């Protein structure tokens, strides 16, 4: 069985652990840099990107994650952290060739659910203070999901990033299965 780590320093950690179990993988909460050596893939969860970034710096995660050669999925704040920039000064991994507009859909009270398409399948996506891709910086970045004209899902190499929270959706398992099939099992 594949072991999928969930960065466990802030954010929707438990919900991702439940989803990982549903796709017959073993979840591992990542609390220290050494935990990263024991996983086949990594999920960087939603939460507060500035807080997660500062904690990643404090505990030495930035360089280690930048040098990982495993699939990485970033959801919501995780998408922000993977990006090259946000227009705001904050710690970022800078390993995904996109810039991000933070809180593109508004505040917490503007949260919503909307049906999107991922890999030809309908998925009810939960957007909470969600970011969106502002600009694609390299042709190696592939759009995998949109909300109208807004880009809400991308992939580049072994990195996948989405604006929404699949761990909070009844059919979010579709996204985890996509990540497993197209990233984790191919690594």
From Swiss-Prot:
InterPro entries on file: Class_I_gatase-like, PdxT/SNO, PdxT/SNO_CS
EC assignment: 4.3.3.6, 3.5.1.2
Gene Ontology molecular-function annotations: glutaminase activity; pyridoxal 5'-phosphate synthase (glutamine hydrolysing) activity
Keyword Magnesium carried by entry: no
Cited PANTHER family: PYRIDOXAL 5'-PHOSPHATE SYNTHASE SUBUNIT SNO (PTHR31559), PYRIDOXAL 5'-PHOSPHATE SYNTHASE SUBUNIT SNO1-RELATED (PTHR31559:SF0)
Keyword Secreted (UniProt): no
Record-given protein name: Pyridoxal 5'-phosphate synthase subunit PdxT
Active-site residues, as the UniProt record annotates them: 76 (nucleophile), 165 (charge relay system), 167 (charge relay system)
Top-rank taxon: Archaea
Task of the protein: Catalyzes the hydrolysis of glutamine to glutamate and ammonia as part of the biosynthesis of pyridoxal 5'-phosphate. The resulting ammonia molecule is channeled to the active site of PdxS.
GO BP: any one term: pyridoxal phosphate biosynthetic process
Subunit field text: In the presence of PdxS, forms a dodecamer of heterodimers. Only shows activity in the heterodimer.
Encoding gene, per UniProt annotation: pdxT
Cited Pfam families: SNO
Similarity comment text for this entry: Belongs to the glutaminase PdxT/SNO family.
GO CC, any one term: cytosol
